[in-house]
Amino acid sequence: MKGFTFVIALIMACSISLSMFSSCGRNDAVQNSDTASGTDSATNIKVTSDTLRVKKVDNISDDFIFGMDASCVPSLEACGIKYYDHNNNEKDVYKILAENGVNYIRVRIWNDPFDKNGNGYGGGNCDIENAIKVGKRATQNGMKLLVNFHYSDFWADPQKQAPPKAWQGMSIDEKCDAVYKYTKESLKKLADAGIDIGMVQVGNETNGFMCGEKDWAKISALMSAGSKATREICPEALVVLHFSNPELVNRYAGYAYELNRFGVDYDVFASSYYSFWHGTFENLKTELEKVTSRYGKKAIIAETSYAYTAEDTDFHANTIGSGFGASEGYPFSVQGQANMLRDVIATAASIENCLGVFYWEGTWIAAGGKTQAENRELWEKHGSGWASSFVAEYDPEDGGKWYGGCAVDNQALFDKNGKALESLKVFALVREGNLDS
């Protein structure tokens, strides 16, 4: 997710910046109080809702991806967090997701998110072992896995793409070899664990910047190394490249041009889309179709999310919240969150060759402490906040200064007590809808 770097700055500058991207283009769902139900005709998943209304989205394919990044779950469970379905039954959270129409899980992988003493950097301490835990549970519940390699020891986004500690000082040829070997070894571990790998993402929000490199010839070489390893270990998996900032006209077309110029082998051009940063739905569609139509690639919305409340639930500032970040027509409410998700899905379904949508960290809730001090202890011990103090050695200018809790707990699809929100039902309701036109 783009934005942890700028959580504090965004809060301070919101009154200036948010007016630029406040409208998403439409809001097709409305709230109604009568009980209604919907069935996902592709999976026979049936849900009902007393409060939520979701308008049907046309032209959703049977294999449309309703995905969820759920990378932080093991670290939260280590804090004592439990998850509950809509009937207050405690369950494996991945089972709850599957029961509500989610068919794909996305998990990020950092090479070595620990200091020399074994203290985790936070953000879920998302190494390969964490990915195996997540992947096994996804597969056990009938969901495929998107493996998201950052090729860093911590968050990689448009502003920072630090190479792993072990790769610092390497030449580009050495780094490409390291990417190839690391990707291959990691995917083999996942495959050997019986995990159903459907897609492999080579880099995260690589906007002309990846693993410390800013030259497109070098970036393309790194991507090609990751793609080659993927083809060898997971020949049936789709290779995904991920970018951000679709609000910038022709930016994606420029990236796709460079990828084509350097012959990078990939299948899917992925975009982040957060309405409070990334402009309108119409622009998102336009920019992605410049890639799918010109280069014959598939597209996917790899990240999106929206707030169900303005409340901060863990004593750490949120990316959006009270007084800032609301997109026009989408209040911070469970219905508002559902409307946003429904309309992102509708946009994806309208884009040429778009595979689907992944909601970002919809399971990342507060660590469970009753005070900031209690939460801080949990964040430091289990890595359940966005960054721990231990990351200062690796990321001194961002994580080292602004470490703390979750900045997106109010954008989860579970409440602060771990109970599934009604908005989680959107995935199952959206094929048929439960709202009369």
Which residues make up each language-model segment?
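Short, acidic/polar
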Residues: 80-98, 179-189, 249-259, 340-344
